[in-house]
């Protein structure tokens, strides 16, 4: 994907560079640098301003790179080791983590280092490989986001139909198709990527398209396939999910008020027991309105029979309890789901809309785009797109209670704490007398030896 082609500035001007840079059909892979050579008149900046801009840029690159690599590696390890998290949704999250990790590793170092050095020193093979892997990683990440949106829509709003095909084997086939489709779609990148001199001892890894018309068609194709279509799919799917959850929230609120009114009128159930809430259908979702957990999405909430009986016997209907009532807990869980869905769609558009807009602008108006975006603007636009690689782990996984617990379990397994040694009694002290709690853990034979006799 043309993430890194806009800024044509390099460190230090060289003779003859203007003709090569301004030739139609040439687009650079390097996006940003500390220098100011471009097809247009360079901007005059003070040395202090340039150094401050470079320091901020390097710091942001380093922070985003470390967060992306660390967060996605943690996701891969946790999802790979935890059997409880091997679900259909988490299979897509694992693929998303791999693509985000590939985006961080294949894009960011090869964007920052050539701009700091002023030339591309890695050769033609690395140039073509980086260009290809960059496009594949962005395509896979975007298609995975759309696949997750469709999977969650099916699971929440069409659960009966989804149970037929929503299996891990089907998810594996979809993920494989996503990677193969992305690999085929990005074949033009290594074909039209070259390392070309643009000045004395200055090389650039660039996309050299056959014509300006081809470049425009390619930019529009990527804009449609990797932004508009996935964006519409995500917006519609999460909009329908939010609507479904909102209807469930309103129904639960009305049902809760009706239940409280009935309890006040009837004086409560015998013995102060609470009856389980009604099961109702709402747009294809089967809602159990009184029993839920933190991770519930409001559909197919099923609890073990023993837990159901304990809840039925111990949940009071009158008087405030120490924690939220089951119905209130369900409402809170649904609100968290709605908030997370809104954050997902917002992050997608915020991170990717500037990049796709800038690439399309440059394809149709190169000089105007270079005048407006050369230097820091396009560099920070690309940093914003890289932010998605570290934002996805935070949104999709670290907001999930079970994943947080799995992270703690994995860390405890990898770094076990040494057993604490019990302090030995001093010579003039009596040994500690076993307590009732410790005696209860002993066998009958051990307890009998401590009795009178």
Swiss-Prot record:
UniProt entry tagged with the keyword Membrane: yes
Record keywords: Cell membrane, Disulfide bond, G-protein coupled receptor, Glycoprotein, Lipoprotein, Membrane, Palmitate, Receptor, Transducer, Transmembrane, Transmembrane helix
Location(s), subcellular: Cell membrane
SS bond partners: 127-205
Cytoplasmic domain ranges by topology: 80-87, 151-170, 243-339, 401-453
Residues spanning the membrane: 58-79, 88-109, 132-150, 171-189, 220-242, 340-361, 380-400
Signal peptide interval: none
PROSITE patterns attached to this UniProt entry: G_PROTEIN_RECEP_F1_1 (PS00237), G_PROTEIN_RECEP_F1_2 (PS50262)
Keyword Metal-binding carried by entry: no
Residues carrying sugar: 7, 30, 36
A GO molecular function held by the record: gastrin receptor activity
InterPro entries: Cholcskin_rcpt (IPR009126), Gastrin_rcpt (IPR000314), GPCR_Rhodpsn (IPR000276), GPCR_Rhodpsn_7TM (IPR017452)
GO biological process: digestive tract development; gastric acid secretion; gland development; pH reduction; phospholipase C-activating G protein-coupled receptor signaling pathway; positive regulation of cell population proliferation; positive regulation of cytosolic calcium ion concentration
Annotated Gene Ontology cellular component terms: intracellular membrane-bounded organelle; membrane; plasma membrane
Membrane topology reported for the UniProt record: Multi-pass membrane protein
Lipidation (S-palmitoyl cysteine): 414
Region annotated Disordered, chain positions: 257-276
Topology feature Extracellular, residues: 1-57, 110-131, 190-219, 362-379
Role summary: Receptor for gastrin and cholecystokinin. The CCK-B receptors occur throughout the central nervous system where they modulate anxiety, analgesia, arousal, and neuroleptic activity. This receptor mediates its action by association with G proteins that activate a phosphatidylinositol-calcium second messenger system.
PANTHER family documented for this protein: G-PROTEIN COUPLED RECEPTOR (PTHR24243), GASTRIN_CHOLECYSTOKININ TYPE B RECEPTOR (PTHR24243:SF45)
Stated family: Belongs to the G-protein coupled receptor 1 family.
Name of the protein described by the UniProt record: Gastrin/cholecystokinin type B receptor
